[in-house]
């Protein structure tokens, strides 16, 4: 059950950024959120995977054990969650609910499946969905293969999933090309600022 305030705040915007594995969501998101003129609060996701270089507990993710994550699932603590390549990812309801109750605009960096769930949940409420796309699938494969050392079957799973996810891009409000993280971040900041301005002016 979703808490009423989670979906009922009509003067707060929900911005979701998603895209295939390896497209650079985390890097672009960090650049966007460093801009103090972006009046958004990053909704920190929870995961069972190990931290990557430069990732900080409680800032990039809440890193937990599989046992703890599954306890949260049993308690219906997630807005959305998914399991991918052996690791869980999810958006804690309580955290998002707290931000919305405080009147904050929320920025979600979530998996594509989670974004689909969020679009349904927030239908009719202020929300912007952004899909980050790579310059080419060949470039995406290069990034995935060189980002970390993984077994070939895991890489194949990531690439297959990326194919399926890219086919869903037309479900999003905006598609942003990540040919340069700075340019992509600037485009997303412009989208957010324009949407916030419209919300302030019209309430919609």
Feature map (PLM): residue ranges:
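Short aromatic/basic micro-patch
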Residues: 6, 62-64, 90, 109, ...
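ATP-binding Walker
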Residues: 23
């Amino acid at each position: 059950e979703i808490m009423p305030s989670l979906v009922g705040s009509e003067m707060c915007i929900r911005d979701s950024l998603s895209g295939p594995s390896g497209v650079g969501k985390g890097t672009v998101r960090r650049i966007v959120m460093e801009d103090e003129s972006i009046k958004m609060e990053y909704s920190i996701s929870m995961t069972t995977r190990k931290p990557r270089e430069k990732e900080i507990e409680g800032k990039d993710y809440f890193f937990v054990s599989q046992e703890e994550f599954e306890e949260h699932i049993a308690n219906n603590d997630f807005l959305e969650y998914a399991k991918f390549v052996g690791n869980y990812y999810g958006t804690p309801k309580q955290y998002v609910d707290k931000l919305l109750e405080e009147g904050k605009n929320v920025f979600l960096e979530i998996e594509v499946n989670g974004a689909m769930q969020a679009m349904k949940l927030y239908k009719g409420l202020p929300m912007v969905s952004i899909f980050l796309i790579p310059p080419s699938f060949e470039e995406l494969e290069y990034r995935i293969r060189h980002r970390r050392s993984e077994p070939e079957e895991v890489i194949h799973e990531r690439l297959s999933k990326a194919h399926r996810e890219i086919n869903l891009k037309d479900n999003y409000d905006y598609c942003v090309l990540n040919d340069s993280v700075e340019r992509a971040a600037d485009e997303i900041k412009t989208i957010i600022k324009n949407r916030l301005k419209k919300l302030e002016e019209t309430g919609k």
